[in-house]
Amino acid sequence: MPPNPTGPTNSQLRMLARFLRKAARANSASIWRVVAEFVEKPRRQRVIVNVGKLNRVAKEGDVVVVPGKLLAGGQLNKKIIVAAVKISPKAARKVIEAGGEVLTIPELVRKYPRGSGVRIVI
């Protein structure tokens, strides 16, 4: 065993990664396997995305998954559906004020099991 474990030691993140891998196999949707790989990364390599980046890369009505943390930097003026591992309260408020929707990743998988139309933002 390596002296410093790599990947998540947080049991909730490990369960989320396991859930995503099972969903990828069950639905033949490789997008969930890719999201699981990002979730399993060590803490220093995890994804951090600001709301302003979502405003730049997403179109109106897009469904977006952030395999890391969503922070409140920047402005959002598009109605989008966002799911992330963690979302700061201020970022969630900005998404909702723009007319969007905030989901957890398991909720997103249940709503879009095949992953069609879901974009990964890293």
From Swiss-Prot:
The molecular function terms in GO held by this entry are: RNA binding; structural constituent of ribosome
What's in the GO CC field?
Answer: cytosolic large ribosomal subunit
**Keyword set includes Ribonucleoprotein:** yes
GO BP annotations, alphabetical order: translation
**Signal sequence: where?**
none
* Keyword line: Ribonucleoprotein, Ribosomal protein
Q: Which residues form a coiled coil?
A: none
User: Is Hydrolase found in the keyword set?
Assistant: no
Family statement: Belongs to the eukaryotic ribosomal protein eL18 family.
PANTHER family from the UniProt entry: 60S RIBOSOMAL PROTEIN L18 (PTHR10934), LARGE RIBOSOMAL SUBUNIT PROTEIN EL18 (PTHR10934:SF2)
Protein name (record) = Large ribosomal subunit protein eL18
Q: Which organism is it from?
A: Pyrobaculum aerophilum (strain ATCC 51768 / DSM 7523 / JCM 9630 / CIP 104966 / NBRC 100827 / IM2)
Q: According to the entry, what is the taxonomic lineage of the organism?
A: Archaea, Thermoproteota, Thermoprotei, Thermoproteales, Thermoproteaceae
